């Protein structure tokens, strides 16, 4: 195998053509800075101290490279990373077209693995990672709650309202209102005080002691509570379903006590004796009266 250890001829041609451009004693080379590559030149200054200058002359840069030389590099398969001078024709075939390079290096594409291109690709790879995209959750959090929708059917609305009312009633504590039972309270007061006049009831309320009032009020309230409990129990019993046969409920009669035959015989004898003695008494009384009458 023939191994080509000599440097490529394209590099020699580059150095030959670049020598007539650089009139001064200058060493030029390309340095890739982020975000854009620039040509940095070291010029000899006073006391032979090198001075770094940047030369972005497009004409000088274009004369260094031609279309034939770039094609020659592609034929020799020289990698882009090893070549110190990027070809000028690669601007038209730039893989990254969305990124605009600097105006001084308009024909030079940016590095595909540079920090700006990598950041742009990472930012716009997905919309979730893009900070400019507003997420739906944030919109829902900012949007006010939607007003209640109108009911499609009146039955559903009424059922919903009744269920809400029932829940409220179940959660609230019911306090009995005795103002609705004034008539019953007055009737109880009339029964206790044995009167039918409101004036006497008012007089008793004015002159009665606090203990008497408390006792009477407790008695009235207890009686009214018992009445309410009885009515509630009756309503519950009436709401219970009747038996499936449809027969009316039979009222149970009190149990009859059967007496033995000896006791029945004795009771019959006693009744006969009482019936026999009554007429004798009457007759004796009548005979006595008859006896007394002639004496008078």
UniProtKB/Swiss-Prot annotation:
It comes from the Eukaryota. It holds the Pfam family SPATIAL. Residues 112-121 have a biased composition (Basic and acidic residues). This is Uncharacterized protein C4orf17 homolog. It comes from Macaca fascicularis. Residues 89-121, 138-162, 232-296 are annotated as: Disordered. Residues 153-162 have a biased composition (Polar residues). InterPro entries: TBATA-like.
